[in-house]
Amino acid sequence: MTISPMKILMVHANREERGKLAIMLARFEHPVTFSDGIDSLEFNPDNYDLIIVDEHLTGGAGILLLHKFSKKIRKKTIYLSSGDEKVRAFYQNSLEIYECMRKPVKPMNLAVVACDFFVSSHFNNGELATLNS
C-alpha cells in the first residue's frame, strides 16, 4: 500500500520550531507550506490535505484561527497546545479537530499522527479496498 504525498499547511510563528517539525514530514515526501500568523494567511485551507496550527501565532492565538475554520477544515487539523490533558481534550472535542498534541512536539510524533490521519482519511474515503493495493 502506498499513500501519495499529501499537501500540508503549517501555521506556526516560530520559524526554527516549524522547520524542525516540517523536516520530518518532508522526509515522507509531503510538501509543506508555511504561514506564521492569523493576519497574514493568504491561503485557501481547502487546498490542503492537512493543517497544523500552533497555539502561538503572529497576530493572535491559534485557537482564534481554528474558530475561523469551517467544521470540515477543523476535522483535518492538528493543533499544537501546551495545555494540560483536560484542556487538550476540550479543544479536540469541542472544536472537532483531528488531534490536539502536547507541546513541545517531537517531530517523529507529529509525523506519526500525520501518517495516521492520512491512512484514516483513505479508509474513510473507501480508497483502501484491499491490503494488496
Segments predicted by a language model, with ranges:
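The C-terminal output helix
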Residues: 115-131
